[in-house]
Structures are given as structure tokens and as C-alpha cells.
Amino acid sequence: MSALQHEELERGMRAQPVSERLVVSPLLDQSQIGPASIDLRLGTHFREVRRLERGVVGAESEAGVAGERREELIVVPIGGHLWLHPGQFVLGSTLEYIRMPDHLVGQVLGRSSWARLGLIVATSVLIQPGWSGVLTLELSNIGDVPLQIYAGDLIAQLVVWQLLGKTDHPYAAGAKYVAPIGPEESRLELETGDRERLKRVGERMRGHGGPLPRH
């Protein structure tokens, strides 16, 4: 795999047929395409994560299973701002719609300028081949002072990698996060089936009388 540089990114965004095109839209300024990455802007929709009275949330917790609402949707117009206080966590999204063709994979990184102020943009990092939508950004202020962030700010950067060949298994239509149009809350509860399988494997291993394997 190799990362696409400036000219290759531009060619990828004009590629024909359209199914093989890298889509990052709207691109408000051509200068967002850097030497080996594309700067992404912060969108207008946010989900503020509320604290719960109970202590934990997880795939098998009551909140996860019952789908209890614990996030508030906030809409900020382009050029408007949101205060992110120390220790606060919100879900945001990119302004740009992204579509990754089957022969490319994306990596999303926070920008150093924001990190030096205490803003962590802990995205899911990897964009699978075949994925499309606006990207959810997990924004957290780990600094000591409130941060004023604006809808439309350059918030992250997209690095695009060329696969050795087109994948036969692109991001599936039945996957958890398909074509989102705004910040999406966690769907960890959909992984409970995997937890049940792990429990059964553990029970079978204990049934053989030996200790669980160590790595």
C-alpha cells in the first residue's frame, strides 16, 4: 500500500468511471488538498453525550439494549460556534461527504494545531473500501480551558492509501454504519451476538479442564 500524493488525490477525485472515483464533497477550497492528505472541515450537527445516573454503559448494559436516549442533537450554522469545556465529549461530523472506492482505504487523523490546544479528534481512524457518508468525529477537550470550535473549521485530515488491488469484500450494506448523514451514536449493542459466541467458546475451553490460553 502507498499513500496518494497531491496529484494522485486530484486525479482520484476526477476518476472515470464514477464508481472508481474518490469523493470528498463539498471541497470549499482547493488548498485543502495538501502534499499527501485532504483537510476536512467540521460539520454543523453535533450530539452532546449526557451523563447517566448509572455508572456504566456498554454493549450489554440496559442503556445499550433498550436504546435509552442519552445524547442531545445540536445544530450550529456554518460560521457559528460551539463551546467545548474541559472534560466534555461531543460527537461531531465532517462537513464533507466521503465515498471511498473499492481500491482505496482512508485514514483520518486529527490536526496538530488543535491537538496542541487540547482537542482530541479520536475518529474511528480507518475508512474501509466501499464506505460512504459523512464521517463521525469523536471530539474531546482534554485541556484546561474551554475551546471555541466553529462549524466549518478545518478539523481533521484524510490520508488515502492505494490497495494492491480492488477488494472483493467492500464495506457491506448490512454493516453498522452505512451512509450516515450526520454524527451517529454508538451501535455497540449490535455486537452482543459476538459476546455470546465468546462466552460459549470460553465455556467449551473450561469444559476441557485446562486453563484459558495465554498470549
Task: Identify the residue ranges that each predicted region occupies.
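DUTPase catalytic domain/fold
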Residues: 1-215
